[in-house]
DNA sequence: ACCATTTAGTTAGCCGGCTAACTAAAAGCT
DNA sequence: AGCTTTTAGTTAGCCGGCTAACTAAATGGT
């Protein structure tokens, strides 16, 4: 018996951490009527409003159909607005509404709270190390998916 | 302009790493006809065949309806078999088929390969540190969801 | 013995993801 | 100009997740 060898792998633990973290963030975001994943769209728009749909997909690292559906829902919630791109009739640009802008503070707070839970009991040193390692690992994954 | 502050947070980076990692594993598993997530069910069964549905849900940290649907699909693929539990008429037990058992090697290989990509260019020391930190973080997340 | 309560799974329906196949507009080539 | 190719988004449909509401069997209290 004993546990399966795969369970001891770093990748396996990472997958479990991800799942838990996503659930954690999702729980906090739900209080603001958001589903986990949608906040990523908002972050990009808070950073630069008026992006085109395709640009959003690239920045989120997501396929176009995902953006189509998410925007439909975010628009339905009145957080976002789609306006045609004057310079390209196939395209559109996404703008935050007042409600969408108003979520910046609360959602940022959710991220901060969830991060405090994530790193609870860890010192500055470990936190920095963890962050650095995550950034390196992210670079690995990005470059390997780009190489395809 | 500059990037939004949320993007600099450890939790944000973690979310991105997760997404990329999941995609990475998913790509490898697809070669064996599996969707990412399904392999978790198989891991539990390789470890202890004949689990009840509810027990599977607990081990995967997933809600019962998720198990219902996944098992229906895995059964449809012929990887798994559901037999009634003789001691409880509401319950059933899940058993691997020969095909399900045959996937153990290949799927383990997928995890190993994806882990090599994940940790590429990192030394033993960093790998160990990263693993330890992930385990601690996982403990944090588990305990906070259990406290609810 | 009986009824209320808890427990095990299912169904329906939503959301974030994906791929495949499509439409329509823009860009390029001749 | 006219035709081909590329690009931008959409639709349909699948999968892993979730919640809410339900069925049916086991358990517990009296």
Regions found by a protein language model. Name each.
Chain A
Residues 15-18, 43-47, 108, 135:
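Short, locally clustered residues in the helix-turn-helix/winged-helix DNA-binding domain
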Residues 9, 13, 24, 40-46, ...:
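Pre-recognition alpha-helix immediately N-terminal to the DNA-recognition helix
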Residues 53-54, 65, 72, 92:
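Residues within helix-turn-helix
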Residues 48-52:
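Short capping segments at the starts of secondary-structure elements
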Residues 1-32, 148:
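N-terminal leader segment of winged-helix/HTH proteins
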Residues 44, 59, 77:
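Residues within the alpha-helical elements of helix-turn-helix
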Residues 22, 72-135, 139:
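Charged, amphipathic alpha-helical coiled-coil/dimerization segments
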